[in-house]
Amino acid sequence: MKKFLLKPKKSLGQNFILSSEITKKIVALAGSLENFNVIEIGPGYGALTREILVHNPKSLLSIEKDRDLVKHHDQLLNEHQGKYRIIEADALHVTEEELIERPVKVIANLPYNISVVLFLKWLNNIKFFTNLTLMFQKEVADRITARPNSKDYGSLSVLSQLLCDIKKEFDIEPKEFFPRPKIHSSVITVNPLPIPKFAVNLETLTRLTRAVFSQRRKMLRNSLQNITNHTETVLENAKLSGNERPENLTIEQFCLLANNVECLFCKSPIAI
């Protein structure tokens, strides 16, 4: 394979899957693809693309930023006319609703350099998707799936798990890719919830969690001072002492805190 591959572009975070066994495991996690439209990001040379097409989706749309790699999909396009299409585009800047109809599943080996930003973009429109089966660098997957009182728990964990049921499925060693990355990868499954687990303004929650986790070793009372001039009132209404550190709070507690930050001038505290 190394003999005919174009030189992978580090600037695009390209690492291609070598194992067909891994592509089979990934696609199987997405469940039945019949009657579903599928989006793939960064198809590369088409290893995952081919496995998706084996499962007979209603349609498959691949989004590839590298023009040189788009050209390598001519054979797949000919073999699956009317079912498969590929566009040259940056996944960060496309509007999925304009490109494909629901119901939609996403199956992707995400480019390392855009994986977090792209996932956050999808979270902001999560109801558009039926489910997502995604490969991340292991460190990011650990952050997404982390629980309170762990070193990986942070803003990404809170936002992801508020909106979705998420499961880390398996890890992948560097030897399974070309070029071989220095880090391990992990596959997670993401199932959007009909409604968030707790009622909250997502913009306020995002601002809050990013602010306090940027100072994760500080007690909550100190880190909240960058967000509100009414720290003690907010803490009292949220039933917190202020001595907690951000990693100690559950998602429910963060939502209660965000609600009270947003409603400083309410006559009574906001409950969930």
Swiss-Prot record:
This protein's GO CC annotations: cytosol
Residues binding S-adenosyl-L-methionine, per UniProt: N15, I17, G42, E64, D90, N109
InterPro entries: KsgA/Erm, rRNA_Ade_diMease-like_C, rRNA_Ade_Mease_Trfase_CS, rRNA_Ade_methylase_Trfase_N, rRNA_adenine_dimethylase, SAM-dependent_MTases_sf
Reaction catalysed by this enzyme: adenosine(1518)/adenosine(1519) in 16S rRNA + 4 S-adenosyl-L-methionine = N(6)-dimethyladenosine(1518)/N(6)-dimethyladenosine(1519) in 16S rRNA + 4 S-adenosyl-L-homocysteine + 4 H(+)
Single GO term (MF): 16S rRNA (adenine(1518)-N(6)/adenine(1519)-N(6))-dimethyltransferase activity
Entry keyword annotation includes Isomerase: no
Record's subcellular location: Cytoplasm
The protein's role, per its UniProt record: Specifically dimethylates two adjacent adenosines (A1518 and A1519) in the loop of a conserved hairpin near the 3'-end of 16S rRNA in the 30S particle. May play a critical role in biogenesis of 30S subunits.
Name of this chain's protein: Ribosomal RNA small subunit methyltransferase A
Species annotation: Wolbachia sp. subsp. Drosophila simulans (strain wRi)
